[in-house]
Amino acid sequence: MAGIVMLMLMAFSTLNGYAQSVKKPDGIVFIENSWMDALHQAQVKNKYIFVDAYASWCGPCKLLKNTTFKNSKVAAFFNDNFINVAIDMEKGDGPALAQQWGIQAYPTLIVFDANGKPVTGTMGYMGAGDLIKFGKLALSKTAAQ
C-alpha cells in the first residue's frame, strides 16, 4: 500500500512540475511573414487582423517588438481580439504587400477585417496605452460598419 501511495505522489509531482514549466507567451503572439495564413485564420476565427509591417534595420520597429509588444496588457488585448501577423516588408511577399498597401515608412501598423479589407492604420512607434487605444478604435470602426 505504501508503495502505491509513493508511486502516486511521484506521478503527481511530475505532472505538477510539467504544469509549472509550461510558459505563457511573452507578448503578442505573431504569425511570422505569412499574410495568407493570417487571412485564413481570421476568416476561420472571425477575427480582425493586426499587421506589424516592419523592416529588420528599423530602430522604432525593434523598440516596438522589445517593449510595447511584450507589455502584458497589450499582449492580452491583441492576443484575445486579433490574429496578429508580423511581416518583414523587405523579404518574401513583403515588398509586394508594401506596394499593395501603400506603405512608405516603418513601422506601419494596420488593422484589416477578416476579409482583408483595411480598417485603420498608423505609422511609427507607440507606447502600450496608445497601442491599446489604436486597437480599440479599430474594433469600434469595424463594429460600426
Positions of PLM-derived features:
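Bacterial Sec-dependent N-terminal signal peptides
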Residues: 1-21
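Thiol-based oxidoreductase modules, predominantly thioredoxin-like and allied folds used
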Residues: 29-33, 53, 64-93
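A short beta-strand-turn-helix
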Residues: 30-47, 78
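Short active-site neighborhood of thiol/selenol oxidoreductases, capturing the structured segment around
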Residues: 44-59
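Loop/turn elements at helix/coil->beta-strand transitions in domains of secreted/extracellular proteins
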Residues: 45-49, 80-83, 113-118, 129
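The canonical Cys-X-X-Cys-His
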Residues: 58-61, 109
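Structural alpha/beta surface segment adjacent to cysteine/selenocysteine redox centers
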Residues: 92-106, 110
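Non-catalytic, surface beta->alpha helical segment in thiol-disulfide oxidoreductase systems
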Residues: 104-144
